[in-house]
Structure formats: C-alpha cells, structure tokens
Amino acid sequence: MKDKSIKVLEFNKIQEILKNYTCTKAAKDIIEDLKPYDSVYEVREHLEEAKEAFKLLITKGAPPFEGVYDIRNGIYLAEKGSALLPGQLLKIAAVLRCARRFKEYINHKEEEESYRVLENICEGIFSLPKIEEEIFNAIEGEDEIADRASSTLYNIRRSLKEKNYSVRDKINSLVRSYSSYLQENIYTVRGDRYVLPVKAEHKGAVPGLVHDQSSTGATLFIEPMSLVNLNNEIKELMLKEKAEIERILTVLSAKINANITGVKTDANIVWELDFIFAKAKFASEYNCTCPTINNEGIVDIIEGRHPLIDRREVVPISVKLGEEFTSLMITGPNTGGKTVTLKTVGLIHLMAMSGLMIPARENSVISYFNNVFADIGDEQSIEQSLSTFSSHMKNIVEIMDKADENSLVLFDELGAGTDPTEGAALAISILENLRKRGTKIIATTHYSELKAYALRKEGVENASVEFDVETLRPTYRLLIGIPGKSNAFEISKRLGLPDYIIDFARENISNENIRFEELIENLQEKSIKAQEDARLAENLKLERDKEKKKYEEKLEGLQKVRDNALIDARREAKNIIKEAKEEADKILKDIRQLERMGYSSDARRKLEEERKKLKDKLDSIEEKEIKTVHKGEALKNVKEGDEVLLASINQKVIVLSKPDNKGDVLVQAGIMKITANIKDLRAAKGSNFNSSSSKIKKSKKLNLNLRRVESSVDLRGMDAEEAIYTVDKYLDEAYLGGLGEVTIVHGKGTGVLRKTIMDMLKGHSHVKRHRLGEYGEGGTGVTVVELK
C-alpha cells in the first residue's frame, strides 16, 4: 500500500483519533503502526474482533482495563535479573490482574452468544494469580511496603516503633530538664537521630554530639549522650528494615523473572485487547458498522460518511462499483463535494482493510485491494502552471506502472492543468488503459468529453454531485447514472450578469452541446424525482413496520392477559380441589376416631352427609365458574358489522368479513384486526342473533371424582397376585376420590400377604407413607396408608 496515498487520504488522522480511546502507550504504539493487512482473511478476522468487542461493550459494559499500564521497562529489567521498584511491581501485578479479569469478562453462559476471535486471543492468557496476590499483599503503594510482606519486616517495624516510643519519652524528659538552654521547648530529627535545638552560648550545658547548626549559627542541634545508644539501636533497626525491603523486592522480582514468558504474554494480550476495544469505542462514537469483505472488486458503500467532517454537517453518500461497471466518472461544480466523495471512498477502504469498522450503514460491501492509489490535490483550473500539471503527471506515471486488476485508483480532476482538448484526450487514454487491465477507477472531471466517454463505453458509468441552482449551493449528494450538468449560465444569471451577455454566450455553443446539456438536465430532474419517491416509499415502509410492530406488541399483550387468566383459573381450580381433599381428610379422621370408639353406623351416616355437602358445594362453584368464563350464545353464522364476543380473550369484537370455507373470519378488537374461527365466537350481551340453542354450553368442567369410595379394602382370602391387583385399583380410586388415608385389611395369618402388600406400597405413585395398624385399628392385621 502506497504511503503517499495513505497520507493523502488522511488515514493518519484516524489513527490519532483512535489513540484517544486507548489506556496504554503500548496500544498507542500498535495504532501508530496500523496499516491495511496483507490478506482478506486477516481483514475479516480483525473486523470480526472489532465487531465482537463492539457487542461486548453494549452487552457487558466497559472492559476491566482499570489500572492498566505500559510495563515494558519493568519486564525488560526483570528479564535482565534486576530488582524492580515497588511501583514497577505494582504495575506488573495490575496488568496480570487485568488479564485474569478479562478472561472472566469474556466468559459466557452456554446459551449466550460466543465471541470466537476474542476467546481465541484470551486462550493465550497464562493467569498468574499467585504472583499477582503476593505483589498486592506485599506492596501498598509506589514507595510503600506493607508490614505483612514478611514476618521479619513485621517484627523489625514493631521493634522500631517501640524504640521510637522509648526515645521520644526520654527526649521529652530532657526537653523539660534543659528548657532554659533551648531555643524552643521541642525536639527534632537530624540524620535519623533525635536531637535538641540548643542555644549556641549554652552548648556546654548539654553534653552530647553536635549534628547540625542553624543558618545563623545561633542554634546547635545536639544529640544528648543519654540518647546515643537508643538512637544507635533505631538506626540499626532502620538499616535492617531497608535490607529486608530490598530482599522482598528481590524475591518478587525473581518470581517475575521465573515467569517472564507468562508475564510478557499476558501483557501483550492486554495491550492487544486495549487496541481492539479502542476500535470498538471508536465505532460506537462514530456510528460505524462492520462491512462485508470480498476480493472480487465489488464495492457497495451505503450512506458512507467521511469521519473527519463534522457529523452534524456531513452528507452521506452511496457508491457502487465493480458489478455493473468498473469505472465511475463524477462530474459537477467546484466545491460540490467531488473530492470529498473520492476521499470518503478511499478512506473507508483503508479503514476496513485495517480492521476498523466503517462509518456507513449495515450491509455495506468493501473490496480488498492490494493497492489504493490516490492522485488527489487542490481542485485545478486550465490556468494551472506546468509545474502543477507535472506533479500530477508524476503520480499518474507511477500509478500506470503499478496498478492492476486488484487496485483501486482515485483520480481528482484527471487531465486538468493543461489544454482542455489535450487534457481530455489524455484522460480518456489513461482511463481506457486502466479499464482494460481490470483496475477499479473513480475519477472526477470537468470535461464534457469524459461524460460522453462514460455514456458510450461499456463498464463505465457517469455520476454527478447535485447542485441547487435556486440557492447557488451544492447539496453534496451523489447521483449515480447521471452526468453532471454545467451550471455556469444559471449561476452567472443569478449573480447578476446581464442577459445579453449570457444570450451571446449561448449562441457560441453548438446545438449539439445545448441538446446534450438539456438531456442531462432532464435526466437529473427525473433522477431526483425518482430518489424522492424512493425516500418517500422507504419512509412509508418504516411507518408501516412501526405500526405493525406496535400491533404485534398489543396482540402479544392480549395473549399474555389471556394466558394469565387461564393460569389463574387453573390455580383456582387446584385450590378448590386441595381444599376439598383437606376437608375430606378431616372428615375421614373424625370418622376413624368414631369407629375406634364403637360408633360405626353413626359415623358412616355422618360421612355420607358431609360428602353430600362437599359435592353440592363443588357443583355450585363449578356452575359459577362456567357462567363466568363464557357468556353469550354459541353462533352458527355471522355477518359483517356484527358485534360478538371472542371467547378466547373474553373481549367484544366487530366482524369485518364473512366466514370462509374453514370458518375463519376477520374481526377487529380495538385497533387490531385478528383472524378468528366462528367456533370461538359467542353472542355478545345485548346483540340479537338466531342461535341454534339458547342454553349455555359448558366448555370447561371441573372433573372431580365424587363417587363413593370406601375407606378400606379387605384382601383376606385372596392370593398375592389378586391382592396386588385389587390394592392397585383401589388406591387409584381412593386417590381420584380425594381420600387422604385408607386402610388395607390383610389379616395376620403367616404374614406373607402383609409382606407382599408392604413391598408393593413402597414404590406406589399414590402412596406418601404407610404403617401397620395400631391398637384399636386392627393391629398387624391391617396396613394404614396415607395418600399424596
């Protein structure tokens, strides 16, 4: 890729913007070296990593880059075997922590979306939590080692603290004793030793060692002899503390050295991730998308925006190239946006090929080119000097030497700077030669000859930048398929040039040129009208989709209401059954108590009375439930305009169509139109219909088994097989009948039948627990079973 083209297209400015989103100098250095990759595969992988990082920013928020540093110098020193400073060790630990946390950050549950490229990068992370923990435990700040760094350091500092307390007590006592000889009644420290500020004239009154004097010489700082030993002990402890700190730093540095490969790898991955997430943050800020990449020369940029132009002012452009045509000629007025179009296309390609998402709409297509050549400068006129023409021609010569079918060439005002006739002929020759090579070309021009060349040559297409003659301002919109019209006469007239001069100028133009310009004007008007119609259609489609989504959400809400109603109904029915079973169980327990007391006949009569009450109660609830759910009469036919009840959602609706052969009708519920079957329609209250029946049909019934089930079963006289069958059938009936506890009579005998029944009950689905009968219940001759 040509460095000159990269510079002309201002890719370096994108790099500078990108650097603002990084956390480390190392990531900035990666961006500094960023350029288009060498293959389509690399481009796709680096775009995918940016896309994945973009998704992670949205779904999981900012990545764990807190406290990430550039630790290259620390790694270098550790690798050489040097002892690192506390701050250097802390920064290395912070990077190791970031690498470990990032592995956790990117982790996802099985059902969540995976991040293939980023996960592959993170696979290389060593994770060194032990070293990380040791450093953070030992070092508290840039120049502060924690007491817990070692037991030796802890003991030294404790002794040092005690000695300092002792010497302060001693020197405070001396301050009071020598107060008349001191400049101030305080003590101070000189060279890590406690001293007194003694007046120079009284130096003999305070025996000791002179360590310093004031700038005026009026004060001597004397260490009293009684403190010398204590100060010596403090000094020794301080030296021991320093030696222990150096030992701790050496040990920690050695551990970094021993794991230098893991540390370097983790650091490099963190810096790479810093760079990748800078790309994602840039994409988020500039509303970028991930394009589709091909190597077939096909370009389809949808509403691309130049990222260096103010986002409030930039006008999106859409450019196609490579399928229907391989060369695009852009014509139009000066300052109309032709050069910006070239730069936008070129810069977007450089960004995509460097793994950056692009400022364009979704589904944009970018081709991978081996080279992007750009001959772009200030817009030129025919009065340009030979030197300027020569400068352009020098670039063109180089392009002609290297461009091939895998190249994109951008020409700004091709052929300008010389005689128009010669310039146009030269431009056509250059374009035709490159076209035959298969080179993809976008060129801007003023020459009518190039418009005509594009009209007649297959594979070459005209385009123009739109100009508003009313306001005398360009709109910067690109119109593909329409050559640019010269607006010199219209602009001159609006600026006040007399009509007779303009008319005379028109007379000097051939009829053929006039007709050509009129044709272009007509095409432009039709194209603009077509684009306006397309935009209107797109807006209508968006509004329709929005309304559709709103109705679908309302329908979903209604369905949820219906589902919740059904759930509530089922829950209520379940509660009714539960209450019924609890009431029946209570009655049975009371009856069993009565039976044990010898009141069997009365108990049975009471049981039947209670069961009848319970059945009547449930029938009443069931009838009430049925009447509540489906009001209205069943319908056989409906007509347009009828108001009916849609039973499934229990809501009144208006019939909009007659039933089809399947019985489906279109109805309106509020603002929604729904297709329903006539079987789901009922006569709404207050509506007159001829129905087949005026009776309320029960569509839902509480299916409770209220037939009488005995509270015990007698197995005496049966063999094992018959007994098992009888008990199984009986337990089903008892369970459906809502009994909570039953008795199985098997007799005492040899105990074989009892054992058979006990074994069967252990795995039975209806049995909660079972036991042998107690005294008064039949003893070991019966088994009492509690049902679920």
From Swiss-Prot:
**Where is each Smr domain found?**
713-788
Q: Which domain of life is it from?
A: Bacteria
Q: Does the keyword RNA-binding apply?
A: yes
- For this UniProt record, give its keywords in alphabetical order, as a comma-separated list: ATP-binding, DNA-binding, Endonuclease, Hydrolase, Nuclease, Nucleotide-binding, RNA-binding, rRNA-binding
Tell me the enzyme class. Answer: hydrolase
Return the Pfam families for the record. Answer: MSSS (PF20297), MutS_V (PF00488), Smr (PF01713)
The record ties this protein, via InterPro entries, to:
DNA_mismatch_repair_MutS_C (IPR000432), DNA_mismatch_repair_MutS_core (IPR007696), DNA_mismatch_repair_MutS_sf (IPR036187), MSSS (IPR046893), MutS (IPR045076), MutS2 (IPR005747), P-loop_NTPase (IPR027417), Smr_dom (IPR002625)
Picking any one GO molecular function of the record gives: mismatched DNA binding
| BP GO annotations | mismatch repair; negative regulation of DNA recombination; rescue of stalled ribosome
EC no. given is: 3.1.-.-, 3.6.4.-
| Binding residue positions for ATP | G332, P333, N334, T335, G336, G337, K338, T339
**Functional note:** Endonuclease that is involved in the suppression of homologous recombination and thus may have a key role in the control of bacterial genetic diversity.
Task: Give the similarity note.
Answer: Belongs to the DNA mismatch repair MutS family. MutS2 subfamily.
Subunit structure, as described in the record: Homodimer. Binds to stalled ribosomes, contacting rRNA.
Q: Which PANTHER family match?
A: OS10G0509000 PROTEIN, OS10G0509000 PROTEIN-RELATED
- The name under which this protein is listed is Endonuclease MutS2
Organism per entry: Clostridium botulinum (strain Langeland / NCTC 10281 / Type F)
